[in-house]
Amino acid sequence: MITKAELEPMLDKYDVILPRKRRYYIETLYSHYKHTHYSNQLDVTSDIIKEKYPEYADTYEKVINKTSGYMFNMVIMRKDLLDAYCTWLFDILFELEKRLGTQNLDAFQQRFYGRVSEIIFNVWLEKQFENGVVDKKRVKELPIVYVEGVNWWKKGTAFLKAKFFNKKYENSF
């Protein structure tokens, strides 16, 4: 974990500080989500972006077809960037809630707003790169520390069941 003494010097040098990208290698962000959760959540998100933020539509398509992305909903960034991101994000999420709700989903799957926000953070950030708002040289990636550990056997087994037998995730690992 990063300490205050380690972080403070980075704040002047970097506009955005993130956990290292998660790499899926054999799947795109969209296909991984489709196998492990419910793809209609991303499809409706795409519709909302096309309606409310059409200038982000191509970036959305580009991002969901990548095999890596910034996950975990963790970021440190300049206040003006964070304000812009949150305004954009919550406008989309509140509309997503209106359209989908959480009925008929178990408690684990009801957390899909957080999962969708992980993916669309990458859309927002990529668009900031494209528009020259954020310089990639002023982005810092830091290693991820799992304080609770990860059961890789259960995680791997659940992934294979999702990919080959359409068994959606039921919990975290």
Label each PLM-derived region with a short phrase.
Residues 1-173:
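ER/Golgi luminal nucleotide-sugar-dependent glycosyltransferases, focusing on the catalytic module
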